[in-house]
Amino acid sequence: MGVLVKKLIDDLNLEVLVEGKEDVEISVNDINRPGLQLAGFYNYFAPERIQVIGKAEWSFLDYMQIELRKKRVKKYFSFDINCLIITRGLEPHPEFIKEAKKHNIWFVRSNLVTTQFISKTTIYLADKLAPETRLHGVLVDVSGIGILITGESGIGKSETALELIKRGHRLVTDDAVDIKDIDGQLIGRSPKITVGMLEVRGLGIIDVTTLYGLSSVVQEKEIRLVMHFEHWKDDNDYDRLGIDNEYMNILGINVKKLTVPIRPGRNIAVIIEAAAVNYRHALMSKITPVDVIENRMNELND
């Protein structure tokens, strides 16, 4: 699914010089500056990219003889271009207006410096075109680590999130987690309709922002750890040493997963806090608690 050029124009507040087709989409987040094409070189030209004319391209065209410029611009517009953008608020050469109208191609203008515009647009497209999915769960920011809590309905995910919020951590989203793969990072967000809301059985929906302040909710967070809740089963052999590596695959990316057995009396919020701190420690140190115990045992045996 691409991004409609019209939506890009609205979102980036661009000035329309020539309107194109309503249904034209952008399907790649790369950007092309057509200096080589305007010089007559079309090998490896990618017309499916957004085309951006900056000060350098504009100056090159300005020094060009009018007849040659008409010829080059006509050739350039013979390709299936989805969108052409001129930056710095520059006044376009009349040949561009004429050919854009002739071929019904979007031609718009930005007042930003070219490098700033390209950077802003690349980030925008990377977000809009990123692979995405929606999972059932709760996403919280615990000590700076994004933790996705999963498990069957009614097992206590939202109640645990509420306890974590009370302890100074932050909610990203409850019940539905929208996840995008942006440059290899899984970024989780809340659907717009439920931002800042938390559903607690027996209490109903509460507005976390109103009750606990603006700092209790964060707009998005990279998912670094998955904690899966399941009812305690006596016959299950749960990991007690932290040496079993289990992962959850989300959009083709493996995320470390911990299974937390739930039963009355266990303080799950404290366990999640410990998991977050332990995860951060593991990123900074190659020595695990198991290694420490083994070293102590070896010292005692010597």
Curated annotation (Swiss-Prot):
Gene3D superfamilies: HprK N-terminal domain-like, P-loop containing nucleotide triphosphate hydrolases. This is HPr kinase/phosphorylase. It catalyses: [HPr protein]-L-serine + ATP = [HPr protein]-O-phospho-L-serine + ADP + H(+); [HPr protein]-O-phospho-L-serine + phosphate + H(+) = [HPr protein]-L-serine + diphosphate. Pfam families: Hpr_kinase_C (PF07475), Hpr_kinase_N (PF02603). Mg(2+) binds at residues 158, 199. It comes from the Bacteria. Its EC number is 2.7.11.-, 2.7.4.-. Its cofactor is Mg(2+). Both phosphorylation and phosphorolysis are carried out by the same active site and suggest a common mechanism for both reactions. The keyword Iron does not apply. The Walker A ATP-binding motif also binds Pi and PPi. The active site is at residues 136, 157, 175, 240. It comes from Clostridium beijerinckii (strain ATCC 51743 / NCIMB 8052). One of its GO terms (biological process) is regulation of carbohydrate metabolic process. Catalyzes the ATP- as well as the pyrophosphate-dependent phosphorylation of a specific serine residue in HPr, a phosphocarrier protein of the phosphoenolpyruvate-dependent sugar phosphotransferase system (PTS). HprK/P also catalyzes the pyrophosphate-producing, inorganic phosphate-dependent dephosphorylation (phosphorolysis) of seryl-phosphorylated HPr (P-Ser-HPr). InterPro entries: HPr(Ser)_kin/Pase, Hpr_kin/Pase_C, Hpr_kin/Pase_Hpr_N, P-loop_NTPase, Ser_kin/Pase_Hpr-like_N_sf. Residues 261-266 are annotated as: Important for the catalytic mechanism of dephosphorylation. Belongs to the HPrK/P family.
